[in-house]
A protein has these predicted regions:
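Beta-strand-enriched cores of mature, soluble protein domains
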Residues: 30, 88-91, 103-108, 118, ...
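Edge beta-strand at a domain terminus
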Residues: 108-149, 252-276
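A short hydrophobic beta-strand element
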Residues: 2-6, 39-42, 68-72, 101-107, ...
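Flexible, membrane-facing loop/turn or short amphipathic-helix motifs
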Residues: 9-19, 76-85, 111-120, 162-168, ...
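Predominantly extracellular/secreted and cell-surface proteins with exposed
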Residues: 21-91, 170-237
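A short, structured loop/turn motif at beta-sheet edges
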Residues: 32-38, 61-67, 94-103, 128-131, ...
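Residues that flank catalytic or metal-binding motifs in active/ligand-binding sites
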Residues: 26, 120, 153, 173, ...
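Tryptophan-anchored aromatic micro-motifs
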Residues: 2-21, 26, 44-48, 105, ...
Length: 276
């Protein structure tokens, strides 16, 4: 059993400036165990209001390629304008051990759809002291890490849409795909960021397919007078046969327009891998 002081850095504005009051400090109690080359750690996050009571929550980390990685999916809140919106949140924590016993890494939080997202620096320092009687769960009792087919979506992909009726292709965009999966291997989140502007959309993997729901938006009718509210979602089945990394995904983009010129449109959508 070991104890860590955890410093989570501030969130940032779109231009990279830190947001005042968003940094925080936590206390973690952790345990780890290795079976051969497979190592797993459990963490209990201490409740600052009751350090001797039940933890706020627990986490499980796996040691992969030199880093400790934790992926968690849970209902969450995202502030859109002045409104708190219910969302499905994904938290990814990646930690790299340092020679002095500390750890440095990144704390990433994103929602699906991508209404909110941020990335912070995180630093763990070994600590000692009394007043904490919380224990982390026994890591030896954790089920083994399962392989995740969705993890194969990684690298740079060109995203393109084609209008079925006319063959018109809309301007393509390149995205860097970084995918993180739950320990069960059945669900994953893919963070798709544009190469030049770091704009983000979020894809989810589950039940053998990738999906993406995009934030609603307002648009003008083609007559330039009326207005509609647009919703859009993509559905892309996992390709047949093993691919690692995934070379291409093809599927359908479903778009609906509600308002003065209502319509439902289906587009062919494709993600084509073009690099690492």
């Amino acid at each position: 059993m070991y104890k860590r002081q955890v410093d989570v850095g501030p969130t940032a504005t779109p231009d990279g400036k830190p947001v005042a009051g968003t940094a925080r400090t936590e206390t973690w109690v952790a345990r780890s165990v290795c079976k051969g080359t497979d190592c797993v750690a459990t963490v209990a996050v201490v409740n600052p209001q009751d350090a001797a009571g039940a933890p706020l929550y627990t986490m499980v980390f796996d040691y992969l390629d030199g880093d400790w990685l934790q992926v968690r999916e849970a209902p969450d809140k995202c502030k859109v304008g002045d409104v708190d919106t219910d969302v499905q949140g994904w938290t990814v924590i990646s930690l790299t051990p340092q020679l002095d016993g500390s750890m440095n890494g990144e704390y990433t939080w994103a929602t699906a759809p991508a209404l909110c997202a941020n990335k912070r620096a995180i630093h763990l320092t070994p600590t000692t002291g009394s007043g904490v009687s919380v224990t982390a769960p026994d890591p030896a009792l954790e089920p083994p890490l399962r392989p995740a087919p969705g993890a194969a979506l990684r690298g740079v992909y060109t995203y393109s849409q084609t209008y079925r009726e006319t063959g018109q292709t809309f301007p393509p965009h390149d995205y860097k795909a970084t995918t993180y999966c739950l320990r069960t291997g059945d669900r994953c989140v893919s963070l798709m960021s544009t190469i030049d502007t770091n704009n983000l959309f979020v894809m989810l993997y589950g039940d053998g397919r990738f999906s993406a729901s995009f934030p609603e938006g307002d648009a003008e009718c083609t007559d330039g007078v009326g207005k509609v509210r647009q919703t859009s979602r993509d559905d892309l089945p996992l390709p047949q046969g093993p691919q690692d990394p995934i070379v291409a995904l093809t599927g359908t983009s479903f778009q609906e327009y509600i308002g003065d010129c209502p319509a439902k449109v289906e587009l062919d959508v494709k993600l084509q891998r073009v690099g690492d």
